[in-house]
Regions:
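Hydrophobic/aliphatic anchor position in the core parallel beta-sheet
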Residues: 70, 98, 124, 143, ...
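Conserved RecA-like ASCE P-loop NTPase motor core of nucleic-acid helicases/translocases
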Residues: 69-76, 101
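Hydrophobic residues in beta-strands of the RecA-like P-loop NTPase core, especially within AAA+ ATPase
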Residues: 45, 126-127, 145-146
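Post-DEXD/H (motif II) to motif III coupling segment of the RecA-like Helicase ATP-binding lobe
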Residues: 81, 138-200
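Glycine-centered short loops/turns at secondary-structure junctions
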Residues: 38, 67-68, 95, 120, ...
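Conserved motor-coupling elements within RecA-like helicase/translocase cores
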Residues: 104-125, 132-141
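Pre-Walker A segment
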Residues: 1-71
Length: 200
């Protein structure tokens, strides 16, 4: 991974809150994972509002600036729209294209998005599991972010696997760990706990 450190620092400095110690630790762990030469398989576990989305955005930026595409898969349309808004606002000063797919986009819109993903014109896609039904192909996928994996059905988890072989995978969950680990199809090796509440 060839990270543009200057751009990354610029991106990080736009975070309007103070990072918690757990956030900093997790971001550093992800950075090490991405440079290790092995596909990352990390679970980030923390309560709602503890800053998992910012961690996902930093990981995305690292991959995007290295020339890879990113996909974030969410269980609900509401989450897709929420993440799309947050990511779009956070990335608006940088030259990356972000799109979304859920059941509310028209077939024509989906077709156009699929074509642009294949050509590498879209850098980051946020989608529900509709992505599996839409035969989406990426030009250069580097990172899969899975939001609340335990909300996906068995069939959807099986389909997730085919995206996975050489990609980095970051799974976010607010569910306490034991249940998540039992239900995890990915046999996750590395776990980051976000236990520090936000500073403000």
């Amino acid at each position: 991974y060839d990270l543009n450190s200057f751009e990354y620092e610029k991106f990080s400095s736009q975070f309007e809150f103070t990072e918690t110690s757990d956030q900093i630790k997790t971001i550093n762990q992800i950075r090490e994972d991405l440079y290790s030469g092995q596909p990352m398989d990390r679970l980030v576990c923390g309560d709602v509002g503890f800053g998992k989305t910012e961690i996902a955005m930093r990981a995305s930026f690292m991959c995007l600036s290295a020339g890879y595409q990113v996909v974030m898969i969410c269980p609900k349309v509401l989450l897709v729209n929420q993440h799309f808004k947050t990511f779009s606002e956070r990335f608006n000063k940088f030259n990356y294209r972000i799109s979304k797919i859920s059941r509310f986009e028209s077939n024509n819109e989906k077709k156009k998005i699929k074509e642009e993903l294949t050509k590498g014109k879209i850098n980051l896609l946020i989608s529900t599991h509709a992505i599996f039904a839409n035969d989406v192909k990426f030009q250069k996928l580097g990172l899969i972010i899975i939001d609340e994996e335990q909300s996906f059905g068995v069939e959807q988890k099986e389909k997730l696997k085919r995206f996975k072989p050489s990609c980095h995978v970051l799974t976010l969950t607010a569910t306490p760990i034991p249940r998540t680990l039992q239900s995890s199809i990915f046999k996750i090796k590395d776990i980051s706990l976000i236990q520090t509440p936000p500073v403000n």
